[in-house]
């Protein structure tokens, strides 16, 4: 939503792939200036990506959808969901179970197994990110 408003193009993956479950991301140098430590893998729930809007700064990238986090001034856009809770994940994977049939989507049980591995680092990242964003 934010990326589209900033002039980025939103698109489906050319091969119909989705990111549904946990996937690795890589912070850029600019991303490491925002938060020094990023989670290795983050929770995703999407089948669309977006191009880097004109004038935006790439903060993190991924393999299936390259643009994972951007900044433009004080506005940030994330492709991933560091805010996801166990209840949200249960609801999304129950009501949106058809998404797990998309190419590249992870099986439902791995969402919960991977959450036990990656949730702490994603939450720690989110705490630091929000604190720095609020302080400006």
What are these regions (language model features)?
Residues 26-136:
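Amide-donor transfer/coupling interface in amidating biosynthetic enzymes
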Residues 1-31:
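Cysteine-nucleophile active-site neighborhood
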